[in-house]
Each structure stands twice: as C-alpha cells, then as structure tokens.
C-alpha cells in the first residue's frame, strides 16, 4: 500500500492541492512478515506464530511469545522501511515544502504486556489505547515538540482543516489541537471517553477508569503513580469512579443501548477488534 501511494504521488505530481489517506493496515495480525525482517528479532528455527492468541501469556511457551514479538517487530521494521520510501518520494517530488504529513494508528496490541496477548476493551491498557500522533509541518514549526494533550482521533480531521485554512462544512465532533500542542501548551479537554463493546474507558490528567457500561467491574488506576496499572484503586476512591463514570455516560448522551447493557452482564471481558462478535 505504501509503494502504491508513492506511485500515486508520482502519477499526480502536479495535482494541487491534494489530500491523500494511506491505510497500510500493517503492522497488524496476522503477522505475515518476510523472514529477513523477522530474523532481526528472532533467528531461531521454531514453531511459527502469526495469530494473536487472545489469552494469558503465562500459559504460552517462551518460544511462541518470542516469535510473536519478533513477527510484530519485523512488521514494524518493514512498515518503517516503506514509509521511508513514501517520504523519500515526497521529497524527490518537491512536495515536503508544502505538504503536511501525519502518522497515527487506530490501536495498539498487547504482546505479553500485563501478561496478555491481544487487544481488548476490558480490561483496557495503554499499549492498546494510547497511540502516537506524529505531525510534520512543512515549515518545520514545532519540530521536536512533544505534548501529552488528551487527544482523540476525531480531533485529527479538525486539525487538518485548521492547518489547511479550510472552514469545516458542518460542526465537527473533534477539536483542532495544533496550536494547543505547539504554541499555547494548554489542555484541549479535561477528559476523554473511549467505548469498546460493553465497556468504556474514561481518562483524565490523573486517572484511568475502565468500567462496564452497567457501572460494574471498575478498574481505577492513578496515572501519577509508578506501575499504575498494577493496582486497582476502585475501593479507595469510589467518588472518583462515580465522577468519571458519569462523565462517560454523559458522553454517550446519557444512556447506553439495552443490548450493550445486556452484553455487559454476560461477558467477562472484551477481546478482539470488537466485543460485539458472537462468542463460540
């Protein structure tokens, strides 16, 4: 996909202005990666593992876990190489001086983090939820700047429109964050809510609450504490749980659909890209 995007740029080098979205999909399971990339991280001859097991890794052999991590890392390296090709094509065509480049992802993946392999919405974890947003301004504005604003994916569209000087054709759910991140260094919002199947995660500057939509089974973590996700502070701070949960309910316009509430009662966790898939 990245090479096709580079080819498109060459074919449309004189297109002005242009907007191009490139969905590489990788690095994503199944982790089919050329052997030469995988061998940079695991050179052993062992059982192949390209599918995430969605289970506790303490029941998985060290060799399988090592191979899973190697295949994932190999895919990251492969994508890095071909994104470099796309970036070099922009440079060769003289596009970098007037083109905004944004790199992000929709989610991450646990490969042994917190003894789990997979991605899930309950319990939630930062290696799945906390994704990077990298922005290169054509004039180098803000180069090297890092920030920890509470930003969500819908904010990216609003930011693109603002930087391009294009008025939004209709009200947007997102908020432009460029100036907050680079110039003002002010918070964009006081919390974010992420919904995944039958659970929500509400995050503010200090707290991370993961809770089912029926208000049960809360996990509360203090982000200011070392090893924050090793301790569930729900019983110590019930008022924080209630406050954040109510913010999440408000973000859902005050209520959840009955079938989601029913699912929250029935399911112990929420694995996979969607907790809405039927259990076998």
Regions found by a protein language model. Give the residues of each.
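Catalytic domains that recognize anionic headgroups
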Residues: 1-280
């Amino acid at each position: 996909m990245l090479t096709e995007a580079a080819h498109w740029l060459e074919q449309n080098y004189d297109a002005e202005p242009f907007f191009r979205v490139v969905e590489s999909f990788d690095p994503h399971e199944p982790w089919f990666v050329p052997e030469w990339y995988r061998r940079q991280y695991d050179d052993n001859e062992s059982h192949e593992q390209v599918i995430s097991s969605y289970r506790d890794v303490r029941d998985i052999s060290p060799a399988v876990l090592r191979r899973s991590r190697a295949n994932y890392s190999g895919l990251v390296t492969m994508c890095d190489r071909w994104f470099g090709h796309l970036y070099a094509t922009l440079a060769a065509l003289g596009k970098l001086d007037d083109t905004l480049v944004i790199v992000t992802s929709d989610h991450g993946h646990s490969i042994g983090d917190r003894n789990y392999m997979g991605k899930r919405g309950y319990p939630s974890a930062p290696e799945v939820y906390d994704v990077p947003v990298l922005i290169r301004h054509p004039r180098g504005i803000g180069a090297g700047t890092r920030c920890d604003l509470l930003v969500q994916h819908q904010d990216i569209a609003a930011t693109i429109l603002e930087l391009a000087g294009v008025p939004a054709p209709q009200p947007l759910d997102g908020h432009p964050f460029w100036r907050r991140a680079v110039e003002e260094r002010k918070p964009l919002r006081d919390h974010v809510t992420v919904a995944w199947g039958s659970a929500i995660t509400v995050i503010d500057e200090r707290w991370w609450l993961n809770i089912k939509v029926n208000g049960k089974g809360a996990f509360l973590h203090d982000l200011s504490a070392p090893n924050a996700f090793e301790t569930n502070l729900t019983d110590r701070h019930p008022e924080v749980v209630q406050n954040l949960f109510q913010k999440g309910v408000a973000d859902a316009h005050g209520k959840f659909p009955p079938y989601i509430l029913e699912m929250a009662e029935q399911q112990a966790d929420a694995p996979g890209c969607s907790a809405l898939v039927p259990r076998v």
